[in-house]
């Protein structure tokens, strides 16, 4: 069995960055800690506002960041705003999670692109519904009630262009046998069970040599229920494992 590599090239100020989907046995472990602060409201009011994001999507994204400190950008959850749409994304180089939703709707907004350590969001914050982000502070909220805050530092550098990995369309016409890493599938399913009432996932793909996208509908703790015409879909991109001929 072989694990296919998805390699793409990103240029930024004449600096080229390669991001690989690599075998899982090569991953290294690392941890990041944050310091909790008091007087959340007073501190928050003095900070420059960056974003207000649904808590659950940040928590899910944090489950799929890299644990390899040598690839620090991939240890972060990336928030991107483009064409009035916010993308929350994370990848460890093996799989990619992303969720897209409208900017400036239902109080959710993003003023600039930013990458934040996934460790900030990994722990379950009881009753949290949204996260307020400033230049130096992340505040967990229950509607308009402040729950807790942590200081953080933004990751410097240009996050990989994930759009280059996502297929534009799907034929769903497969001519060759293929398999998936069961751990990667199971880890996404564990998150889907918390956010989807029917606990169902859908596979979409073209051929086993290109990425597949697994989707699930978000309808538990979904803050977008009142947003007409928007279908909240969790997306999980993963490469098949092919047998050698």
Q: Model-found features: residue ranges?
A:
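DNA polymerase processivity clamps
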Residues: 5-7, 17-245
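Short, positively charged and aromatic/hydrophobic N-terminal segments
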Residues: 13-14
């Amino acid at each position: 069995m072989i694990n296919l590599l998805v390699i793409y090239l990103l240029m930024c100020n004449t600096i080229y960055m390669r991001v690989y989907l690599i075998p899982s046995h090569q991953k290294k472990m690392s941890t990041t800690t944050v310091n909790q602060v008091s007087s959340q409201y007073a501190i928050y009011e003095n900070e420059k506002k960056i974003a207000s994001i649904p808590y659950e999507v940040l928590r899910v994204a944090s489950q799929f960041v890299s644990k390899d400190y040598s690839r620090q950008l991939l240890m972060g959850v990336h928030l991107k705003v483009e064409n009035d749409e916010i993308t929350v994304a994370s990848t460890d180089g093996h799989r990619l999670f992303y969720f897209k939703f409208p900017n400036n709707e239902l109080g959710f907004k993003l003023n600039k692109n930013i990458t934040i350590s996934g460790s900030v969001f990994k722990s379950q914050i009881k009753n949290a519904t949204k996260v307020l982000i400033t230049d130096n502070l992340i505040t967990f909220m229950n509607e308009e009630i402040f729950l807790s805050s942590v200081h953080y530092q933004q990751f410097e550098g240009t996050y990989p262009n994930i759009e280059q990995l996502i297929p534009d369309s799907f034929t769903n016409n497969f001519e060759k046998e293929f398999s998936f890493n069961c751990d990667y599938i199971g880890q996404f399913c564990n998150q889907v069970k918390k956010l989807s009432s029917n606990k169902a996932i859908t596979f979409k793909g073209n051929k086993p040599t290109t990425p597949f996208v697994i989707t699930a509908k978000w309808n538990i703790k979904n803050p977008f229920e009142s947003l007409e015409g928007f279908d909240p879909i969790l997306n999980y991109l993963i490469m098949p494992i092919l047998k050698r001929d």
